[in-house]
């Protein structure tokens, strides 16, 4: 018995104890079962605590180390985030210890980690799917647009200042950011198996390849296999998939191991020939065709999704109008209302549609004074006040709540050149 114990102890020295291998073995009709938890319980102590039983020999080995996997896209809003969350949950169900990663996010819908730091909401959802707490290493770089040409840069969960697009993409500090995101990935990879990575937008923006931090250059650093996600619902799926593959370097093209056709509507049999054609022209296998889903409610982070939302009042429901600001922030605040059957939630800056609302919501803004100026210029501010006099309820969140006051002041010019402006109150 002790000879077997010695051999098993030697064997365990070669295992990754963080995976907590379950061990069951027998010798001379004696069965001993033990669970080793990251070295917290010694094998000898665990064996002494268990009664002997007769039985068969079985050793449950740790799961193999997997390559990191990146979901890259033919464009924005093709479904990368949802598929990454799905894979995180599938790996968890299969006994692995996965974690999500996206090197750089551009979104106004952020999420606070347990430490009070900011990451993109998609990675927070993916972390929940993976069964792990969210951390800034999962999204080390977050860009929060403040205007058409500038954004607040959030590094490791903390704002480090505003940058213009040119400054951000073309300055020497870019390589420092690359080191930061690479180190964040390395820390995750040392703790989790596998890391499920997400690219950003399209992988075919060849004019930005030398400064790209999030797509194929990140996959190269991670030695990741890449799956290309193509959206068939918006049309042009063959051109977008083929173009995305063809525009890559030979080295990067080899990383793309498969294609997923997402958001398919109709009878899949009608696309069977399409699968074969795509495999022929791209030279890459199609791993699957995913139906268009209507019942998966995961908070969006991409403003592309906002453009698809309802825009008009309807009869027979409580009409709740969200004022469509140019720099609207955290539109996911209203998702629960969107799924309430009693409510028609719509986004608009049309004066006539605002006047039909029972409730008007002023949302958060990344540039509050600039958005308030625009509301006054286009007549929306006057329409909100008139709707309030007509009996509508007006509520504000964050920057929208500030707009409801008597005056907004920005003496230090944090958001722009306008130092103060009268509010709606």
Please describe what each predicted stretch is.
Residues 1, 127, 266-269, 406-425:
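Pocket-forming structural segment of enzyme catalytic cores
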Residues 1-8:
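Phosphate-handling substructures
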Residues 2, 39-63:
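Domain-level recognition of soluble alpha/beta enzyme cores
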Residues 8, 25-29, 199-201:
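Short, well-ordered beta-to-alpha junction loops that form the rim of enzyme active sites
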Residues 19-25, 56, 68-70, 194-196:
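Residue-level preference for the first positions of well-ordered beta-strands
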Residues 33-37, 86-90, 406:
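Active-site signature of alpha/beta-hydrolase-fold catalytic machinery across serine-
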């Amino acid at each position: 018995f002790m000879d077997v114990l010695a051999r098993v102890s030697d064997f365990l020295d070669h295992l990754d104890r963080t995976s907590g291998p379950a061990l069951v073995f027998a010798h001379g009709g004696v069965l001993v079962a033990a669970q080793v938890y990251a070295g917290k319980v010694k094998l000898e102590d665990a064996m002494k605590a268990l009664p002997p039983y007769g039985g068969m020999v079985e050793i449950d080995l740790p799961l193999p180390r997997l390559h990191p996997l990146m979901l890259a896209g033919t464009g924005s809003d093709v479904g990368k985030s949802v598929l990454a969350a799905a894979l995180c949950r599938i790996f968890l169900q299969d006994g692995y210890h996965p974690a999500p990663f996206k090197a750089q996010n551009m979104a106004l819908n952020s999420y606070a980690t347990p430490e009070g730091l900011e990451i993109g909401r998609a990675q927070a959802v993916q972390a929940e799917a993976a069964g792990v707490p969210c951390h800034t290493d999962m999204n080390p770089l977050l860009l929060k647009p403040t205007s058409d040409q500038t954004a607040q840069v959030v590094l490791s969960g903390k704002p480090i200042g505003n940058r213009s697009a040119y400054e951000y993409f073309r300055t020497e500090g870019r390589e420092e950011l690359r080191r930061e995101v690479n180190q964040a990935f390395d820390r995750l990879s040392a703790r989790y198996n596998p890391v499920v990575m997400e690219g950003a937008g399209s992988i075919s923006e060849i004019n930005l390849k030398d400064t790209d931090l999030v797509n194929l250059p990140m996959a190269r650093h991670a030695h990741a296999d890449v799956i290309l996600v193509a959206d068939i619902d918006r049309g042009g799926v063959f051109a977008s998939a083929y173009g995305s593959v063809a525009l890559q370097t030979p080295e990067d093209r080899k990383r793309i191991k498969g294609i997923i056709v997402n958001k398919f509507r109709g009878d899949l049999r009608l696309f069977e020939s399409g699968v074969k054609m795509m495999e022929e022209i791209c030279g890459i296998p199609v791993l699957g065709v995913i139906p268009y889903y209507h019942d998966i409610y995961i908070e969006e982070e991409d403003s592309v999704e906002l453009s698809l939302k309802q825009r008009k009042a309807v009869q027979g429901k409580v009409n709740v109008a969200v004022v469509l600001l140019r720099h609207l922030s955290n539109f996911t605040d209203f998702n629960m209302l969107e799924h309430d059957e009693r409510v028609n939630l719509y986004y608009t800056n049309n004066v006539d549609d605002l006047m039909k609302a029972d409730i008007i919501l002023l949302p958060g803004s990344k540039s509050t004074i600039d958005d308030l100026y625009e509301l006054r210029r286009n007549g929306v501010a006057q329409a909100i006040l008139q709707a309030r006099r007509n009996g509508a309820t007006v509520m504000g969140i964050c920057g929208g709540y500030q707009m409801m006051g008597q005056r907004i002041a920005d003496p230090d010019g944090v958001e722009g050149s306008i130092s103060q402006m009268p509010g709606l109150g």
